[in-house]
Amino acid sequence: MSLSIRVNEKAFGKGSFKTSVLQDVNLTVENGEFLTVIGPSGCGKSTLLKIAAGLDGDYEGRISMNGREIKGPGIQQGFIFQEHRLFPWMTVEQNIAADLSLKEPAVRKKVDELIETVRLKGAEKQYPRELSGGMSQRVAIARALLREPEILLLDEPFGALDAFTRKHLQDVLTDIWREKKMTMILVTHDIDESVYLANRIAILTAKPGRIHKLIPVDLPFPRSRTSPVFQTIRQKVLKEFETTETFSFQEGSGI
């Protein structure tokens, strides 16, 4: 699976009210790659992810998967939002199955497997009000994986969680990626998270967002945040990120 992203321009508004959010973004994500996307606030990270998922078609450019143009959402793309968006009247297993019937043996088997994968064994019958934030996001991850998408797109899914839970779910996500060998693209504000998870990091400039730098992360798994190599890559990413932040400040200040 190769995902080709070309966004000549994405803008909101018309005429004198037009605001360009993304410009001249060209990116290819290879099969099995874990790409993280970082950049200043408002640079269009989440918008780019929604375009890649087929959730936003109002842009100039082309998104294709294995040469086939993506014109809307499909089962080949799984999407996880910043909020878990679980149905409050459904149990964990019902939320994972969503519109599919748990009475179907194949669905039942798949849901049970995913409950094991995201480490929710024993919580199958619980409702969202009984779950912690981390558990709720694990349900959302399992639901996104149910139809076995070719690519999983994640829009800051751990942003609202405490540090301990966040690190735990990063490990869960890494295990899923390594086991299923699927392609993942994750948007984040967290540089440590970006280095911990990714094969490659895309850094966007300030609005309008463009690709500022692509940085490979050549680290074996499992990774240690305290290792010298990890810290070296982190400092490299931070330096490039600060460059985009400085540019954003200068643009806004008229310097």
Swiss-Prot record:
GO terms for cellular component: plasma membrane. InterPro entries: AAA+_ATPase, ABC_transporter-like_ATP-bd, ABC_transporter-like_CS, ABC_transporter_ATP-bind, P-loop_NTPase. It is an enzyme of class 7 (translocase). Its EC number is 7.6.2.14. Keywords: ATP-binding, Cell membrane, Membrane, Nucleotide-binding, Translocase, Transport. It is found in: Cell membrane. PANTHER family: ALIPHATIC SULFONATES IMPORT ATP-BINDING PROTEIN SSUB, TAURINE IMPORT ATP-BINDING PROTEIN-RELATED. It is a peripheral membrane protein. This is Aliphatic sulfonates import ATP-binding protein SsuB. The keyword ATP-binding applies. It comes from Bacillus licheniformis (strain ATCC 14580 / DSM 13 / JCM 2505 / CCUG 7422 / NBRC 12200 / NCIMB 9375 / NCTC 10341 / NRRL NRS-1264 / Gibson 46). The gene is ssuB. The complex is composed of two ATP-binding proteins (SsuB), two transmembrane proteins (SsuC) and a solute-binding protein (SsuA). Residues 5-231 form the ABC transporter domain.
